[in-house]
Amino acid sequence: MEDVSSGRASMPARIAATVPSGGLLAAMPAYAPTGGGLMTKLVSLFPGNSGTSLPTHQALVIVFDAESGEPLALLDGTSITTLRTAAGSALSAELLARPDARTLAILGTGVQARAHAEAMMRVRPIQQIRVAGRNRDRAVSLASALQDTLGVDAQAVDTYRQACADADLVCAATHSPVPVVEREFLKPGVHVTSVGYNTDGREVDSATVADALVVVESVAAVLAPPPAGCNDLRLPIEEGLIEPGHIHAEIGELLTGAKAGRTSPDQITLYKSVGVAAQDAAAADLVLTAARRQGLGVTIDLSA
């Protein structure tokens, strides 16, 4: 993320092809010289897969040699996307959430919801988790699984409002076209992470954005036109509630100390993620290094 904010990374806005069913296939190339490399990710987003045996996000990552351009590896990008997205949110919580944050709200019931709960446990002393989603049965199932695997009190609730009530951390990971995070749901001092993407709507309402200290991965990425940007920030700008300068900082600027983070215990902070390819490059480099060390994978001769 420091590469992104310093300009060392080469990372054009993603492009996508859409299909009539509402799905899309996006291309996300990047070069990240520090702890990354040269790669591109191809990722499909098909919200209609929710509740089926297929994930909503499916991806491949292709790694290239940054000196010669030679293809080096083809990796499962679905797992990489899940883990790097949750890791980015956890990094934002490490930098912005109150140190005493103990109650976590999970909005959504998919793979990102579970990954976010697991990631937040690594950076804050979470003691209680509340889960809400469109499907009550799936919320109950996720809460039960989190309680078993994480060893904390995890309960399903009926509404997003109930999940957010008195929460110190709110993680939104949905495909909702209408806000699941509303300002009136939130208590002072909460840290919100939002990774949901919907071309027809948004996950966080304008009032929350206007009141919050807003941090992103890349200002250029969030303000880019679809499919690269996000309605969560574009719409409040169009409504005249905020200016583009309301975006306080990029994560990389917090890491280097170029910008400060939370300034008071009661401040609401918001990390709006659109997912940037530099994160995929860094994650792919870690996976490829580990695979080589452990002798994993299959070698394919493309010239044969």
Language-model regions: role of each:
Residues T109-G110:
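Glycine-rich Rossmann-fold phosphate-binding loop(s) that bind the pyrophosphate
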Residues M1-T82, A90, D100, A249, ...:
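N-terminal ligand-binding/catalytic initiation module
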Residues L104-A105, T269:
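Conserved beta-strand elements of the Class I
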Residues L96-T103, P125, K187-P188:
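Short helix-loop-beta connector
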Residues V152-L241:
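Rossmann-like adenosine-cofactor binding region
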Residues A113-R114:
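N-terminal Rossmann-fold NAD(P) dinucleotide-binding loop
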Residues G201-A304:
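Adenosine-phosphate binding glycine-rich loop
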